[in-house]
């Protein structure tokens, strides 16, 4: 019966916040370099905050009512990485609040950074005991230590904590460099990813571009050599993603496609930063086409997600008994 089913949204749904707020930040920056209103950027940021609030409420409610289901997600070799999206999006929301209400931004950042560090220490260090299955090695492994530390650096830059931002940036960069060879080796040589996991490949687009965005946040926005090199590697990853489109589009659209969104939105922001540094040249030429392209991708994701919501296919409901501990099923 429908009454026996309860809302069960996996932590991966926080990925919707990543791309939405990331594009909001891109439009905020666009309003500084172009004669466009800041309201579009602020509107996307507010939309992302609302989505984050709803998802956070659902996640906390599930944690309180069905802690066993959250524990199962945290212990899952693949899904556990996506749980780290909760502190990641909390820190992005903190960045969104910086121009409006700094004390709240500091509180959200403080909470998010403590949670992300604690979870990364528990989850990632736990993988070092040699029991992580090879088939569970996917780009999702970037999330706890790479994405979260880059976002921490971005938040530090927005709040003016430059030295702390550099520390987090270093943690993210070296985590990225240590993980990428392992992940690429698995993708190349250890069997094809199952269809349901192929959209996790979208995360592969993010590290270089989010690292570039984090570096620009802590270096005062200077489009220096390092920023351009990171951007270049991000563009190369974009070409790889385009090449593999038929492969990961072999499944119907679902919320997991938002894994591409944070890298895409970071492409927009970093492209604008580098392009606004001059009135001509390579980056100036790329800035507008890339900005249009990224807006097109995010718009498609928003429209398709809204369609899923209207069709009743977005909000996952699960039998109550499945979410309860075995001893509580009676």
Curated annotation (Swiss-Prot):
CDD domains: TDT_TehA (cd09324). The chain crosses the membrane at residues 8-28, 36-59, 80-98, 102-127, 139-159, 162-189, 195-218, 225-248, 255-275, 284-310. Keywords: Antibiotic resistance, Cell inner membrane, Cell membrane, Ion channel, Ion transport, Membrane, Tellurium resistance, Transmembrane, Transmembrane helix, Transport. It is a multi-pass membrane protein. Pfam families: SLAC1 (PF03595). The keyword Ion transport applies. GO terms for biological process: monoatomic cation transport; response to antibiotic; response to tellurium ion; transmembrane transport. The keyword Aminoacyl-tRNA synthetase does not apply. Its main location: membrane. It is found in: Cell inner membrane. Residues 29-35, 99-101, 160-161, 219-224, 276-283 are periplasmic. InterPro entries: SLAC1/Mae1/Ssu1/TehA, TehA, TehA/Mae1, Tellurite_res_ion_channel, Voltage-dep_anion_channel_sf. Gene3D superfamilies: Voltage-dependent anion channel. The record marks 262 as: Important for gating. It comes from the Bacteria. GO terms for molecular function: identical protein binding; monoatomic cation efflux transmembrane transporter activity. One of its GO terms (cellular component) is plasma membrane. Coiled coil: none annotated. Residues 1-7, 60-79, 128-138, 190-194, 249-254, 311-330 are cytoplasmic. PANTHER family: DEP DOMAIN-CONTAINING PROTEIN, TELLURITE RESISTANCE PROTEIN TEHA. Homotrimer. Each subunit forms a channel. Responsible for potassium tellurite resistance when present in high copy number. Ion channel involved in potassium tellurite resistance. Otherwise, phenotypically silent. Belongs to the tellurite-resistance/dicarboxylate transporter (TDT) family. This is Tellurite resistance protein TehA. It comes from Escherichia coli (strain K12).
